[in-house]
């Protein structure tokens, strides 16, 4: 259940406290994005404090940490169904063992971005538009992330955007009319 935050007059701001994994948190803290980042769920112990994990989830948490970090904001965690391992939101952010399985068809760069990166952090695949990777950190890490190889600060590769070089590139390439900023998805 979503409830209006106490003291709000416009009726537009709300807090989501259901199912209530963090009932003791005051609305002013709950609505503070800095508090949300500081209090992310990042460990197996934190998950098990609130959820009964399936064997696939527990193994996934234990074995996937070197590929993509575990991080879930309290707000997003509150949307997870406690007793349903098939809850879509739960599947989005809690690792499963299948995530660690390797296939001979796996690709190091599944989006093919590296070959279209004139400077680190800027993908120029189409004539008049670029993708500017501005950060490699997100509030919560989605398990299906197409950039999981370069986000969260773990794994073999990291994103090292060269901002000044990217700005120079954009100044020199006047055909670019559309710059898509990516990375660091919202809470």
Labelled PLM ranges:
Residues 137-141:
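Short pre-active-site segment immediately N-terminal to redox-active cysteine/selenocysteine motifs
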Residues 1-124:
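Flexible, acidic/Gly-rich N-terminal and inter-domain linker regions that tether
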Residues 94, 106-133, 143-187:
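Conserved Radical SAM active-site core
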């Amino acid at each position: 259940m979503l409830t209006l935050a106490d003291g709000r007059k416009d009726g537009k701001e709300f807090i989501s406290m259901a199912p209530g994994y963090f009932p003791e948190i005051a609305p002013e803290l709950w609505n503070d994005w800095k508090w949300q980042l500081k209090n992310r769920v990042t460990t197996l112990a934190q998950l098990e404090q609130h959820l009964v994990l399936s064997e696939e989830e527990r193994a996934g948490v234990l074995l996937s940490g070197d590929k993509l970090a575990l991080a879930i904001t309290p707000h997003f965690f509150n949307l997870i169904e406690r007793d349903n391992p098939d809850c879509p939101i739960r599947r989005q952010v809690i690792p499963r063992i299948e995530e660690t399985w390797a296939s001979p068809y796996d690709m190091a760069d599944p989006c093919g971005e590296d070959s279209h990166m004139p400077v680190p952090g800027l993908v120029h695949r189409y004539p008049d538009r670029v993708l500017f990777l501005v950060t490699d950190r997100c509030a919560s890490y989605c398990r299906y992330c197409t950039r999981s190889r370069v986000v969260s600060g773990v794994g073999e590769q990291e994103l090292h955007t060269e901002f000044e070089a990217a700005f120079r590139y954009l100044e020199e390439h006047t055909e670019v009319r559309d710059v898509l900023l990516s990375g660091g998805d919202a809470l």
